[in-house]
Amino acid sequence: MDVILLERVAKLGHMGDIVRVKNGYARNFLLPGGKALRATEANKKHFESQRAHLETRNQELRDQAAAIGEKLDGQTFVIIRQAGETGQLYGSVSPRDIAEAAIAAGFDVHRNQIALTTPIKTIGLHEVPVVLHPEVSVNVTVNIARSPVEAERQAKGEEINVVEETNLDELGLEIGAALADAGGSLGDR
């Protein structure tokens, strides 16, 4: 299906481009989201008549996103979660959690703007991209910790005591070697 893009779409094109996309992508994402119009003759004429208005609206949105991006770029958000001794979270931190932390800090960020490919499942400092506009993207740091004290220590760069996972195979070999050195085995008793 040929569509006319009403805004810049990543890996597809800029506003005003006529591109060919799969029918499902157009019907389920581009058309309902107001990102494109079907490329019919009537829509082409309508788009050309509205082009100046759409460009000014897009420029205003980009300027607003750039202003928010200047304040948001480099910010650190602390999220407190329960985690095991190895640093693995008992759940995960999703884009919604990061957006809620940003909103609590006074930033207007929607969860769809958080470009997290997979949920975060470990404690520590994590860089997360935030796409405020197709042309404006910034990075924020998410500090995931078990307590506020631990979050402060992580922010200062101190090492957090995380118990390393024990490899049971290596442990068995070490016990076997110790028994061999002692001249006995487990079956001697």
Swiss-Prot record:
Q: Does the keyword Ribosomal protein apply?
A: yes
Question: Family, per the entry?
Answer: Belongs to the bacterial ribosomal protein bL9 family.
Protein name as catalogued: Large ribosomal subunit protein bL9
The GO terms describing molecular function are: rRNA binding; structural constituent of ribosome
Q: Which GO terms describe its biological process?
A: translation
Q: What does the record give as the function of this protein? A: Binds to the 23S rRNA.
Q: Name one GO cellular component term.
A: ribonucleoprotein complex
In which domain of life is the source organism classified?
Bacteria
Keyword set, alphabetical order: Ribonucleoprotein, Ribosomal protein, RNA-binding, rRNA-binding
The reply on keyword Cell inner membrane is no
**Chain's gene name:** rplI
Q: Enumerate the NCBIfam families for this protein.
A: L9 (TIGR00158)
Question: What PROSITE patterns does its record include?
Answer: RIBOSOMAL_L9
Quote any Pfam family the record assigns: Ribosomal_L9_C
